[in-house]
């Protein structure tokens, strides 16, 4: 059994449902310490994090990832227990197999092998690992980055081991991510008897035109690196608990996924202009969960693409598709950030899995990238 597969199995066995680490980080820390890494445990609240490093020079190359996983859902729908790593037809199944315990296992084994072969390597190799990526992400990577900045540690390059590949390992890497902003909107009407609508003000009826306008608005055209901004309602609630009552309020929740084309303030102003145009009485609360970032095709991305070409014989596609990741926190330091990991098709799904053969290739890609950077 390969070292990467062995480590992945150990991690899958730990039911580390966010924000519980379930001992995963102890396994990783013990392995890294055994090859000379210095490690700091950085707990914040109930979240476990660690920071590890080997070397004392620049450039500073960081591997970043998370040990927490999403809940398995209905376990009767799994063909094997979600926290029992199970090999079948060349794949390994288990919660976290794709997102992202395979990435973590490959990064750690690659770093181990590299420092064993190059104990006096140029540069510094580091790890930022958290158990708070699948949850609120308030006490995880963001807090570790704040800690490093307080210590004046300057990061140069970061590989986030998220499942970035689409159909084949290495066919895509992320060189940026869209931002995410949530809005919680309350449309205020007047409650009344449903038989006497002239004595009430129905917030549901009032909202229709404005909601249609918001849903049909073309916020931008995107650009060569980012798809157009997306606006989606994901929850609408109204009703007074009885069939003969016009409700006093309607509550709606929506989300923007946006490129660096806009500021959050510009998007907020556009929404409020539409609501005002339709003369709605409303209250709105905003929550910016992440700002967009774009690292571009820098030195790290160039070397990662070279490593993928050498090992997987693919011309990888750099893109900015998908959701948010902890790379957004690391990018605020000015560090070049890319995301490179396994195929993402089954992430968060029942019977989550990864191709076993991809584990060694992914380990080799990380190892080769370290060679090229140092």
Curated annotation (Swiss-Prot):
So what EC number does this one have?
Answer: 3.5.1.18
Q: Which PROSITE patterns match?
A: ARGE_DAPE_CPG2_2 (PS00759)
Q: Which SUPFAM superfamilies match?
A: Bacterial exopeptidase dimerisation domain, Zn-dependent exopeptidases
**Pathway noted in the entry:** Amino-acid biosynthesis; L-lysine biosynthesis via DAP pathway; LL-2,6-diaminopimelate from (S)-tetrahydrodipicolinate (succinylase route): step 3/3
What keyword terms does UniProt attach to this protein? Amino-acid biosynthesis, Cobalt, Diaminopimelate biosynthesis, Hydrolase, Lysine biosynthesis, Metal-binding, Zinc
Q: Name one GO molecular function term.
A: zinc ion binding
- Tell me which domain of life the UniProt entry assigns to the organism this sequence originates from: Bacteria
What Gene3D superfamilies does the record point to? 3.30.70.360, Zn peptidases
Q: Which Gene Ontology terms describe the biological processes this protein takes part in?
A: diaminopimelate biosynthetic process; L-arginine biosynthetic process; lysine biosynthetic process via diaminopimelate
Residues holding Zn(2+) 2: 99, 134, 348
Q: Which positions does UniProt annotate for Zn(2+) 1 binding? A: 66, 99, 162
Question: Would the keyword Heme turn up in this protein's UniProt record?
Answer: no
Q: How is the cofactor bound?
A: Binds 2 Zn(2+) or Co(2+) ions per subunit.
The similarity annotation says: Belongs to the peptidase M20A family. DapE subfamily.
**Quaternary structure and interacting proteins, as annotated:** Homodimer.
**HAMAP family associated with the record:** DapE (MF_01690)
**What NCBIfam families does this protein's entry cite?**
dapE_proteo, PRK13009.1
Q: What is this protein called?
A: Succinyl-diaminopimelate desuccinylase
Gene this protein is translated from: dapE
